[in-house]
Amino acid sequence: MITGRDFIITSLQSWDIAIGSNAKDIAKEISRHNRVLYVNTPVDMLNYLMHSQSPDVQRTKTLIKNKKNGLRQITANLWTLDCPFCAFPVNSFPDGFLFDAVNRLNNKRICKHILSAAQELQFTNHILLIDNDIYRSFYAKEFLKPRISIYYRRDNMTSAFWKKHAPRLEPLLCSKSDLVATNSPQLAEAVKSYNSNCHDIGQGVDLESFRDG
């Protein structure tokens, strides 16, 4: 069991999601013996304009208006972080240079906000866990400089949201991660060629085999 470490978790699933969330369950389990900062992905500008009454947009508006950093303490060892800004809606961009350039800007801004919160919490030598967030965490390893970077794959990437960019980006994200974890043998087999340090952990979060010493 890993204890006494600092974890930063980036996920597409908002902490305030009404339904059950595998990402939240993982964060809660890890926080039993470690400190966890769970990052809610920012609202993009398109959703900000088109879905102004949604809870995520309303929360973003409140943060911007009150000039708050969005850091909330959930338990003694667990915090969530909202972003007081909007991200560029890059998913509609053609795949290639333009997408990469703007996506990197999104990543840089998000990670700058994360680092500010991590510094406030006095996180050190943190472990980064990217929960299926291929786009907005693609450059997180470079910008956050974690002690260990883990990509957790729990989706087949077959939905329309992933079709344009994920086939190119996911192999790259797998390759540069220190390890890849999946929740099924099939998902592990699909990406094992990109990273030999790939493990099927089912629905659990036992990270003992990933200990870095």
What residues fall within each predicted segment?
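A conserved catalytic-core segment of Leloir-type glycosyltransferases
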Residues: 50-120
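Membrane-proximal helix-turn-helix segments that form the acceptor-binding/catalytic region
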Residues: 26, 109-119, 123-125, 161-183
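Nucleotide-activated donor-dependent transferases that construct or modify glycoconjugates
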Residues: 1-23, 42
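A short, active-site helix/loop in glycosyltransferases that binds the activated sugar's phosphate group
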Residues: 138, 177-200
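An aromatic- and histidine-rich active-site surface loop
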Residues: 96, 107-111, 126-144
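Carbohydrate-associated surface elements
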Residues: 186, 204, 213
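Short amphipathic alpha-helix
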Residues: 22-30
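Active-site proximal beta-strand in glycosyltransferases
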Residues: 7, 127-131, 141-157
